[in-house]
Curated annotation (Swiss-Prot):
This is Aminopeptidase O. Signal peptide: none annotated. The keyword Cytoplasm applies. The active site is at 482 (proton acceptor). Pfam families: Leuk-A4-hydro_C, Peptidase_M1. Disulfide bonds: none annotated.
């Protein structure tokens, strides 16, 4: 595989050789250093067999040696320079993780609050000495490859798990007969195979093993995308250490986390959904097939709150004065890309008033939990873990425990727009899909540099502050979208990341269903709202397809190669590093329209009970498009399939660019007979066009035009249609602003308003464009392009001025796209 890819334009490489070894559990022990903008410490990885290792014969294991030939050169395992520990500063509350863990002969590499001495020499692998291995009698050593980027790796060592007392009752390892190497491998092999009902004991064993001493440094090398590890004389994965410890620290420029300030000006750091995921936060196996559990202990100054995607609601443990330790864990195996962390001066927001009674009323669409979930047996098809789908109490829990965190300055906005919505949105999701896959939920309002409206991880959702403006409409729909990801994107993941529609298409389709249910809309009103939103998305999809290359319009770009990996397990994500991809919505929109087409074709009474059944059968697993489509059609009598087949759906919707024929026909029919809400908007547009044609000086006493009250979605559609007008006078724009109170509307409405302001150079509202670029960065990227193509010096200066103010904290992809627009 070519690993010298252009990091700004090419496909994203997934380098880990998961076919040979799979990480089963991570234990992270980290310190957050805001002064130097680094996270440092160590991570212990526990391995099981790879995807194809169990089926291999001795002859096929020769491929391991062939795949290792690319790594002739390794650095000599050099001891880290470590400062002596002042015993007077040791705190017994820290546990014996603070004791000697750097390997034989080394002293503790941490000072009293867990940080590496900042004066020590940084033994980065990129500046290390190299040598060739000659100690394996001509055989190549097996090479463990981890995904890694922008990390300073100080040392890698094998962990002596055999030195941990008390593991005998959990393992079958024959201590008397086994060699030390064999014994260590057997202990870990037994540990990762413990049954789900022993998860507490398993986590405790993992913790104690992670604190065991090292028993020999391993040789390491790296390139731009990976960390490569080997042990001299070990030629197959079966003989490679099953538990290794990596000492490392992140770099301030690493793209996995963003170091910035919150809305109160306080420092914070969080995972912001980088294209490279978490490989600049910790060495890991990125391919989604590498599903693992994890534990993490994170230390930070006492003024900070540490939130993570763990299943427990962690409480801080005091360390020495001024520092706290936070511990999280998960027992459901998931890809490393789902790991999330946010450290900042967040305040928990608690509702001051109960939500309206009508939003808390229980009801069902289309089946109640008792009717639906009991139709399926309690067996699960995923790897063993403590699963909520097997719990009767979890199945009936429509509202899981939740918390909301934000900078204190946003408390009022959270009270008005968010807190009262959460119970109804959670209940609505449960009424549609059944059991919540995760036991709790934290919601964090992230800093202004967050590049999207929301991001879901297990047990935690990041929301942009842009969702808190205007009415509750944008906040509610976005919250429903992110909640939908609990099922599609997290509990059920795509086996091939290029099939992004399996996550985003489903969440976009379900957000409308959840939101209508949360609002308690009668069926006819829910249908009208959904038709209006389909109209808006149709306009957006047309714009996307006009302005994107054909290769990025395909939902299944790898076609028959989808899901395939190399012999080692490595692969690439097509267009994964293209900075423009993060701002495209083709996978959201085409995926949404496919699911809408299937729902309308088959009927809601068939589709949604099927979807609930699909979730029950496939949670905890990775899927491809055909898994969903095949099960859908298998659950429909042949005489009701209306000519649908997996082959024609894949051909017409997933593997073609442009607009599918079925969608063109549907929208053509909609244009001929628009929905009531769209017709109402059309009438209002006609009024505004007449107003715009009036002479500037009107006679006194002329009757004012009466405009209808419109919903936020209707205002967006109105502004989109008005954008098609060649000219709008300043008087018309002023009247438009006053009529709909546009500066106070939600971010979707204000975005369209800013487009009108720029197009017609309405100078009185330039300050609103500037405010949008500074405060609504999740949606403002497109406006920079509009400002520059306006060819108006004042507008172009506004663009440059705003970019100068925000570029330091803007994520790299956003900054790159804006730079190309401006320069």
């Amino acid at each position: 595989m070519d690993i010298k890819l252009d990091p700004s334009r090419d496909d994203l490489p997934l380098m880990a050789n998961t076919s040979h070894m799979l990480v089963k559990h991570y234990i992270l022990d980290l310190d957050v250093d805001f002064g130097n903008q680094v996270i440092e410490g160590n991570i212990v990885l526990f391995f099981g067999d790879g995807n194809r290792f169990k089926n291999q014969s001795r002859s096929t294991q020769e491929t391991f040696q062939m795949e290792s030939e690319e790594a002739d050169i390794f650095r000599t395992a050099e001891p880290c320079h470590v400062p002596e520990m002042d015993s007077s500063t040791f705190s017994p509350k820290m546990g014996h993780r603070e004791c000697a863990v750097c390997g034989k002969g080394d002293q503790d590499a941490f000072d009293n609050d867990g940080n590496h001495d900042n004066q020590e020499r940084d033994s980065e692998i990129s500046s290390s000495k190299y040598c060739c291995d000659t100690g394996n009698h001509g055989k190549r050593d097996f090479l463990l490859v981890l995904d890694c980027c922008d990390l300073s790796v100080l040392k890698v060592e094998e962990v002596d798990v055999a030195a941990v007392p008390g593991l005998e009752k959990f393992t079958k390892a024959p201590k008397l007969l086994a060699t030390p190497e064999k014994l260590r491998c057997e202990i870990v092999r037994d540990l990762v195979a413990l049954p789900a009902d022993a998860w507490r004991e398993q986590l405790d064993c993992y913790t104690r093993c992670s604190q065991a001493p090292g028993c020999g440094e391993l040789l390491i090398d790296s390139d731009n995308w990976s960390l490569r590890i080997r042990k001299t004389g070990t030629s197959t994965p079966a003989d490679f250490p099953r538990a290794i410890r990596i000492w490392y620290k992140t770099k301030p420029e690493g793209q996995s986390v963003a170091w910035t300030t919150d809305q109160n000006g306080r420092p914070c750091v969080y995972t912001m959904g980088s294209p490279i995921n978490n490989r600049a936060l910790f060495p890991c196996q990125e391919p989604p097939v590498a599903m693992s559990t994890w534990q993490a202990t994170v230390r930070a100054a006492a003024s900070f709150v540490v939130l993570m995607s763990g299943e427990n609601s962690a409480k801080p443990t005091p360390l020495r004065e001024g520092y706290m330790s936070w511990h999280y864990y998960v027992t459901m195996p998931m890809p490393a890309s789902t790991f999330a962390i946010a450290v900042g001066c967040w305040t928990e927001m608690k509702p001051k008033a109960s939500p309206p009674d009508d939003l808390m009323t229980e009801h069902s669409l289309p089946l109640s939990p008792s009717e639906a979930d009991l139709r399926y047996d309690n067996t699960c098809n995923h790897m063993e873990y403590p699963c909520r789908f097997q719990s009767a109490s979890a199945a009936s829990q429509d509202i899981i425990p939740y918390r909301v965190f934000a900078p204190v300055c946003l408390e009022g906005a959270c009270q008005e727009a968010l807190l009262w919505l959460i119970p109804s949105c959670l209940s609505a999701a449960h009424s549609v899909l059944g059991t919540h896959p995760f036991s709790r939920l934290d919601i964090l309002i992230v800093p202004t540099n967050f590049p999207s409206l929301g991001m879901a991880s297990p047990h935690i959702i990041f929301l942009s502050q842009s969702t808190l403006t205007g009415t509750s409409h944008l906040c509610g729909t976005r919250l429903c979208h992110e909640i939908a990801h609990s099922w599609f994107g997290l509990a059920i993941g795509a086996r091939d990341w290029t099939e992004e529609w399996l996550s985003e298409g489903f969440a976009t389709h379900l957000e409308d269903i959840f939101w209508a249910e949360a609002q308690q809309l009668p069926p006819h009103e829910a249908l009208e709202q959904q038709e209006l939103r389909a109209c808006l998305r149709w306009h957006r999809l047309q714009d996307e397809l006009r302005n994107s290359p054909e290769g990025m319009q395909v939902l299944r770009p790898n076609k028959e190669e989808t899901g395939h990996v190399s012999a080692s397990g490595a692969s690439v994500v097509k267009h994964g590093l293209n900075p423009e991809k993060g701002f495209m919505q083709v996978h959201y929109l085409k995926g949404y329209f496919l699911l809408r087409f299937l729902t309308r074709t088959l009927g809601e009474k068939i589709y949604f009970p099927f979807l609930r059944k699909f979730v029950h059968l496939f949670h905890g697993q990775l899927i491809l498009s055909q898994d969903f489509l095949q099960m859908l059609l298998e659950n429909i009598p042949e005489n009701k399939r209306l000519g649908l087949s997996v082959e024609n759906i894949v051909r017409d919707w997933l593997e073609c660019s442009g607009i599918p024929k079925a969608l063109q026909e549907e929208r053509k029919a909609e244009d001929c007979s628009p929905s009531r809400l769209a017709r109402q908007v059309g009438s209002e547009v006609a009024k505004w066009i007449r107003v715009n044609r009036r002479p500037r000086k009107r006679k006194r006493g002329k009757r004012e035009v009466a405009f209808e009250k419109l919903s936020p979605d209707q205002i967006v559609l109105l502004l989109e249609w008005l954008l098609e007008q060649k000219t709008l006078s300043p008087q018309t724009l002023h009247c438009l602003q006053q009529t709909y109170h546009l500066p106070e509307q939600d971010a979707e409405v204000r975005h369209r308003w800013c487009e009108l302001v720029i197009k017609h150079k309405y100078t009185k509202a330039y300050n609103q464009v500037e405010r949008f670029l500074l405060e609504d960065q999740a949606m403002g990227i497109y406006l920079y392009g509009e400002l520059m193509v306006s060819e108006d010096a004042r507008l172009q200066q506004l663009a440059h001025r705003c970019f100068e103010l925000v570029k330091e904290h803007m994520d790299r992809a956003s900054a790159q796209v804006v730079t190309e627009m401006l320069f």
